[in-house]
A protein has these predicted regions:
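Short, positively charged, Gly/Tyr-enriched micro-motifs
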Residues: 8, 21-89, 149, 201-203, ...
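Short, solvent-exposed helix-loop connector elements
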Residues: 31-34, 281-290, 302-322, 339-343
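Active-site-proximal, Lys/Arg-enriched surface segment
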Residues: 70, 74-148
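Domain-level cores of phosphate- or acyl-group-handling catalytic modules
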Residues: 164-222
C-alpha cells in the first residue's frame, strides 16, 4: 500500500504557516544559545502569524496565550538580523521553491514601491528620497522582481533602496539574476520609475524584450503626446553612464483612444510606451501587453494586507516584515501547486512538508 499522502483539495492556514515557520527555522540560525528563554521557532511563529493576520507583533503577543512577551520578540528581531543577511537569505528563500513552479519561459515584472515616511525630517538617514508624493519626499522604498504566471506573482527578489541607490543600479542586479536562471524570459515589464537612459541601455545590453510607460520629459515627447493619432516614433534619451554621456535610441509606441466620459474625461487619451519586443507590432499591442501586468495588482494589495503593522523606523525590521509577507505569498502558491493543483501526466509525489 502506498504511503503517499493525498491532498484534501485545499491548503489550510495552519499548514501554510507551519511550512513557512519550519523553513525559516531550518535556514536562519538566530544563535540564541542553550539558555535562552525562547527558541527561534517561537519568534518565527509570532513573526509569520503577525504577517498572516496583518497585525502588529505587540497585538499578536497580547492576544495569544502561549506567545512570548512582545519585548522579547522585538528585541531579537532588532538584534539578530542585519540588512545584508535579511536581503541575501530572504531572496534565496523566495527563489528556492518558486523556480520549481515556473514554466520554461516567463514574463517578469520589476517595480518600485514607495511607502511614505511622515516622521521627523531630521531622522531620514537611510531612507530613499524622491519627488514629492502624498505629502512627503522621504520613503521606505523596496524594489521587487517577480515572474508572472497566469496572473499570479511569484516573487524572485526584493531589494531595499536608500539614498545613493538608483533605479538603474537595482535593475542591473535584477537583470544579472535573470541571466543566471534556467528559465527563459519572454519580456521584462517595468514601471515608470525605471524610465531613464541608463535603464534602457541596460535592457538593450542584456538583450531583453521590454515594455514600460514613458515619462513626459522634454518638449519633443510632450509635443508628440499632445497631437496626432496612434503611431510609432523613434525617441532618444541622454544621460551619464559611468562617466561620459550616453544617448540611447528606442521606439515609442503611442496608443490613442477616445475617453468617452471615462473618469469624467473627454477627448483623446494618448499613452506612450518604450517597447522593444517581437510580439509588439502596433501601439495597441504595447498598451495591451503592458496592461496585463495590472492583473497582478490584487497580489500586490494582498502583500500590503499581509505585512506586519508597525511604526518602527528600523530598516532591518521593516525589510524583514516585507520579506516574510512575500514569502507567505510564494509559499501559498508553491503548496497549492505541489499538493492541490490538478495532477499532470505522471503525477507528483506529495510529501508532508508541513508536518
Amino acid at each position: 500500500m502506498s504511503n503517499t499522502k493525498q491532498a484534501d483539495g485545499e491548503i489550510h492556514e495552519d499548514q501554510l504557516l507551519n511550512f513557512l515557520v519550519n523553513k525559516l527555522d531550518e535556514e536562519v540560525d538566530l544563535g540564541l544559545g542553550a539558555n535562552a528563554e525562547i527558541d527561534a521557532e517561537d519568534i518565527y511563529e509570532v513573526l509569520v502569524g503577525a504577517c498572516a493576520d496583518g497585525t502588529s507583533i505587540s497585538k499578536l503577543c497580547e492576544t495569544s496565550e502561549d506567545s512570548p512577551h512582545e519585548n522579547t520578540v522585538l528585541y531579537h528581531l532588532r538584534e539578530k538580523f542585519d540588512l545584508a543577511s535579511v536581503e541575501r537569505v530572504g531572496n534565496a528563500l523566495l527563489q528556492k521553491d518558486v523556480l520549481e513552479v515556473l514554466p520554461e519561459q516567463v514574463e517578469v515584472v520589476a517595480d518600485l514601491h514607495l511607502r511614505p515616511y511622515y516622521g521627523d525630517e531630521d531622522e531620514t538617514d537611510g531612507l530613499y528620497h524622491s519627488e514629492a508624493k502624498r505629502g512627503t519626499t522621504a520613503f521606505h522604498t523596496y524594489a521587487t522582481l517577480y515572474a508572472r504566471v497566469k496572473n499570479k506573482r511569484h516573487t524572485l527578489a526584493v531589494r531595499r533602496l536608500a539614498d545613493g541607490d538608483t533605479a538603474s543600479s537595482v535593475l542591473a542586479e535584477f537583470l544579472g539574476l535573470l541571466d543566471g536562471l534556467d528559465t527563459g524570459v519572454k519580456a521584462v515589464y517595468l514601471d515608470r520609475e525605471f524610465y531613464d537612459s541608463k535603464c534602457l541601455t541596460l535592457l538593450q545590453a542584456h538583450n531583453y524584450a521590454y515594455v514600460m510607460p514613458i515619462v513626459r520629459w522634454g518638449k519633443t515627447i510632450k509635443q508628440e503626446l499632445s497631437e496626432g493619432w496612434s503611431r510609432i516614433i523613434q525617441h532618444k534619451l541622454t544621460g551619464k553612464l559611468d562617466g561620459p554621456a550616453v544617448t540611447v535610441e528606442f521606439p515609442v509606441y503611442i496608443d490613442c483612444t477616445y475617453q468617452n466620459g471615462r473618469y469624467d474625461e473627454h477627448g483623446v487619451a494618448r499613452h506612450g510606451y518604450a517597447a522593444d519586443a517581437p510580439f509588439i507590432q502596433t501601439p495597441r499591442d504595447a498598451r495591451y501587453h503592458y496592461a496585463k501586468r495590472f492583473g497582478i495588482e490584487a497580489s500586490y494589495r494582498l502583500s500590503e494586507q499581509s505585512v506586519v503593522t508597525t511604526t518602527t523606523q528600523n530598516p532591518v525590521v521593516r525589510l524583514l516584515y516585507v520579506v516574510v509577507s512575500l514569502l507567505l505569498q510564494n509559499v501559498w502558491r508553491y503548496l497549492h501547486w505541489e499538493y492541490v493543483a490538478t495532477p499532470r501526466r505522471g503525477g507528483r509525489i506529495s510529501r508532508a512538508a508541513w508536518s
